[in-house]
Amino acid sequence: MSQDMLSRAEKNASKASITNVKFVLSPITKIPLESESADCIISNCVINLLGQDEKPVCFKEVHRLLKPGGRLAVSDILAKKEFTEELKRDMGLYVGCISGASLVGEYENWLKGAGFEGL
């Protein structure tokens, strides 16, 4: 998220009189919010843009932020088999949220490793 996107989100929330939301500009792997402070965290085509080593860190951070019984809603593209190095480096596929796709099993392991249940 950029500062411009953050400003737009705040403006839209204000226009809609939404007051129970907080927008924070920070690295996704180290969010400056208190533990167990979020009821729901939504990610749309973001986590797959992280490097492979950052993805499990991201899920641990999200789990830390969620209140007991909180929900994580993720929309990401997952792969059934490993992409070739050429496909991983393809900028068009990266921008289209494809080249950063993780394997289904990896994703499930990262979520479980972070403490998520009921996948």
Predicted regions and their residues:
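Short, glycine-/aromatic-enriched active-site segment of Class I SAM-dependent methyltransferases
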Residues: 78-98
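Acidic carboxylate diad motif detector
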Residues: 74-76
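A short acidic, Gly/Pro-enriched loop at the edge of an enzyme's catalytic core
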Residues: 29-41
